[in-house]
């Protein structure tokens, strides 16, 4: 009779970070995804000016998407999530910096910083 292998028995399923760290990082990524996407659509578009400057606006959209992707890779449990998290941290840092000089962006800026810190621990 074949032994049923559990997820923890298989080498290819090992991921950096323990379950608590992964859960915390996933939560931070989803928070940042939500914050960036809502802020672009509900604040930046309304505010106009520097808030919709192409470089800033594209960075916020990219940040939202990489955060969603990082959360997805951790939720599905692939071992390569650390590389996605490293890219996520880099983009989140850039997004936080871009948001820092604009009014009404402090919540998004802080969400990006928290996500970057969590992702750096996973990378």
Positions of predicted regions on the chain:
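Amphipathic alpha-helical hairpins
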Residues: 2-123
């Amino acid at each position: 009779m074949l032994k049923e292998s559990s997820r923890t028995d298989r080498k290819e399923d090992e991921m950096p970070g323990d379950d608590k760290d992964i859960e915390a990082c996933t939560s931070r990524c989803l928070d940042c995804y939500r914050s960036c996407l809502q802020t672009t659509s509900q604040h930046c578009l309304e505010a106009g000016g520097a808030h919709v400057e192409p470089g800033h606006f594209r960075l916020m959209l990219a940040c939202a998407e990489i955060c969603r992707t990082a959360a997805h890779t951790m939720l599905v449990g692939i071992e390569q999530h650390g590389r996605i998290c490293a890219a996520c941290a880099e983009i989140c840092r850039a997004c936080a910096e871009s948001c820092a000089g604009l009014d009404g962006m402090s919540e998004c800026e802080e969400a990006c910083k928290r996500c970057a810190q969590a992702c750096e621990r996973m990378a």
